[in-house]
Amino acid sequence: MASPAKKVVRKKRERKNVTNGVAHIHATFNNTMITIADTAGNVLAWSTSGAKGFKGSRKSTPFAAQVAAEDCAKKAQEHGLRNVEVYVKGPGSGRESALRALQAAGFNISFIKDVTPIPHNGCRPPKKRRV
């Protein structure tokens, strides 16, 4: 006979009082990930296009990135976050729309920096698509 299922006790997220933070927008060709942390690097909130219910090629759209950024901003504002530095990484289509969504959410953006890694002729890139 199977043993009864154990209840999983989830730890309630405590409300930190943080005013300054860092937002990382990672826009890939397939998805957009937004992470908001405090200045020490402790993550306050995160969200992705896939976590917001978009599947397949819809994850890579600017609208999906906007929805994910709005969700992440709402979670971070529960901790009292007001001022944000934004780091954008990747070539995806959700870069600008995620940034605009963070701005529209009421964050005071102090600076925006593009931290996309650029190879000095490193790995061979993927072959071109033939449609």
Curated annotation (Swiss-Prot):
<dbReference type="InterPro" id="IPR001971">
    <property type="entry name" value="Ribosomal_uS11"/>
</dbReference>
<dbReference type="InterPro" id="IPR019981">
    <property type="entry name" value="Ribosomal_uS11_bac-type"/>
</dbReference>
<keyword id="KW-0689">Ribosomal protein</keyword>
<dbReference type="Pfam" id="PF00411">
    <property type="entry name" value="Ribosomal_S11"/>
</dbReference>
<protein>
    <recommendedName>
        <fullName>Small ribosomal subunit protein uS11</fullName>
    </recommendedName>
</protein>
<dbReference type="GO" id="GO:0006412">
    <property type="term" value="P:translation"/>
</dbReference>
<dbReference type="GO" id="GO:0005840">
    <property type="term" value="C:ribosome"/>
</dbReference>
<keyword id="KW-0699">rRNA-binding</keyword>
<dbReference type="GO" id="GO:0019843">
    <property type="term" value="F:rRNA binding"/>
</dbReference>
<comment type="function">
    <text>Located on the platform of the 30S subunit, it bridges several disparate RNA helices of the 16S rRNA. Forms part of the Shine-Dalgarno cleft in the 70S ribosome.</text>
</comment>
<dbReference type="InterPro" id="IPR018102">
    <property type="entry name" value="Ribosomal_uS11_CS"/>
</dbReference>
<keyword id="KW-0694">RNA-binding</keyword>
<keyword id="KW-0687">Ribonucleoprotein</keyword>
<dbReference type="GO" id="GO:0003735">
    <property type="term" value="F:structural constituent of ribosome"/>
</dbReference>
<comment type="subunit">
    <text>Part of the 30S ribosomal subunit. Interacts with proteins S7 and S18. Binds to IF-3.</text>
</comment>
<comment type="similarity">
    <text>Belongs to the universal ribosomal protein uS11 family.</text>
</comment>
<dbReference type="GO" id="GO:1990904">
    <property type="term" value="C:ribonucleoprotein complex"/>
</dbReference>
<dbReference type="InterPro" id="IPR036967">
    <property type="entry name" value="Ribosomal_uS11_sf"/>
</dbReference>
